[in-house]
């Protein structure tokens, strides 16, 4: 599954770490308008491409999922207008739900 992560702050960084551990997920890029964002630093350590602009990336037709954790309604709307029909978007609350479920599972495994 090819995933693009938009937003590399605290939430994006946490999700990136979790997603990177899953062998069925290919993170094709991490985007943040702040080139010093923590998630971009982590992505570089994982050798994942990093970007400061998402506009061209969301139009790629080989993406399965775009995860938007920017908490910016305009970004979410823009992604929705420009993404291919077969690409799904997960917004901040959906991404947080997934993160919480994964964290709970990890706690039970310990």
Predicted segments, located by residue:
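Glycine-rich adenosine-cofactor-binding loop
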Residues: 1-17
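Short active-site oxyanion
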Residues: 2, 26-29, 62-66
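Short, well-ordered alpha-helices that flank and scaffold nucleotide-derived cofactor binding pockets
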Residues: 17-21, 81
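NAD(P)-binding Rossmann-fold cofactor-contacting core
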Residues: 22-46
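Rossmann-fold NAD(P)-binding glycine/threonine-rich loop
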Residues: 39, 73-110
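Short acidic-hydrophobic, aromatic-tinged amphipathic segments that line or gate anion-handling sites
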Residues: 49-56, 90
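Rossmann-like NAD(P)-binding element
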Residues: 56-76
């Amino acid at each position: 599954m090819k995933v693009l992560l938009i937003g590399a702050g605290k939430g994006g960084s946490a999700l990136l770490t979790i997603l990177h551990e899953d062998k069925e997920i290919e993170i094709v890029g991490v985007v943040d308008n702040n080139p010093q964002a923590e998630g971009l630093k982590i992505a570089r350590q994982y050798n994942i491409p990093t970007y400061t602009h998402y506009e061209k990336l969301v139009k790629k037709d080989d993406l399965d999922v775009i995860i938007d954790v920017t908490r910016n309604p305009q970004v979410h709307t823009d992604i929705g207008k420009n993404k291919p029909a077969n690409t799904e978007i997960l917004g901040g609350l959906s991404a947080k739900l997934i993160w919480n479920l994964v964290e709970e599972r990890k706690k039970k495994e310990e």
